[in-house]
Amino acid sequence: MRLRELIFGAIAVALLAGYAVLGGRVAPFVAPGAAATPRPARPVSAVPAPMVNGTIAFILRGDVFVLRNGQYTDRTTEGRSVQPALSADGATLYFARVEQIDGLRRTDGAVVNAQLGFSNIVRKPAGGGAEEILLKGLVAPAPNRFHDVMWLLAPSISPDGKRMAVIEGDDDGSADLVVFDLATKKPNVLSNRGDWADPSWSPDGTTLVVTSYDRGEPQLLLKPVDNRPAVLIKGIPEGEPYRASYSPDGKWLVYTLRHDDGRRNDVHAIEISSGKDIALTSDGTSWNGIFSPDGRQIAYLHADGFTIDLWVRDLGGALSDGGLGPPLKITRGEGIDGASRPAWGR
């Protein structure tokens, strides 16, 4: 999803506290059901859920929820959080939080009042506890109200927990990939006036897979963190691929394929070395897939009408031409944010 769509999606979550219709060019299309179904209330206490291994973080009505030990519960309550990430051990939670400040901007030669949007990257224990703002999108508050702000989105934590990749959005419309050393906060900029999104680390910590819109239509790129040239993933079926992440063994990517009709999305996996591509869903209303830490399952979002839920499915022998296990519904229709990919840690 491009920067402006990420921003609009973040603002929609913050202001509407729900998923509604995701209007982005590569956002999933969700068709209305035969009849409207009342949505359950936002959970205010732990919700029983099927047992899955590890910890899964997801966004529900603008807040981060964490699934572990057979229940999910909120870790934020302000309704402005998007795009969760987890450390590999599942112990630490990261996410972007949307903020705004009264300011001024020059428009067509005139100075006008403006609500300036930005986002911070926040860290806190996955089990609950105090928050820490790691990166601030309010770069330079100014007494004259011409504040310097930026969007910091899509955090992704390296396997060793020492680095964090983010997408940094600037006023010129660029969306660049930046890796921060978490100890020193020193940035390593890996693109220049790019149009990138959705970073995710390789298991060995040497490469990030991103969605690139540099040529208009989305492409999946493998970008080495030592800043060697990016490599294009080939073998993608007809359609628009986006939001990929690695398998634990580093051999596969799971990603979403938006079909040519512009209305349907499905979860696919592609073998990096061979280009072998496998459809893991075929219903046209599933997206945002991720591998489990042991590589035996995927978690993904699935829509039934306007209701989006988190599902988990055993891969079985699907990556070796076998069959998938049955899907397992995790949430209860409370309002999953369809623009935010879930995260899964041990």
Regions found by a protein language model. Give the residues of each.
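Sequence signature of WD/YWTD-type beta-propeller architectures
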Residues: 2-346
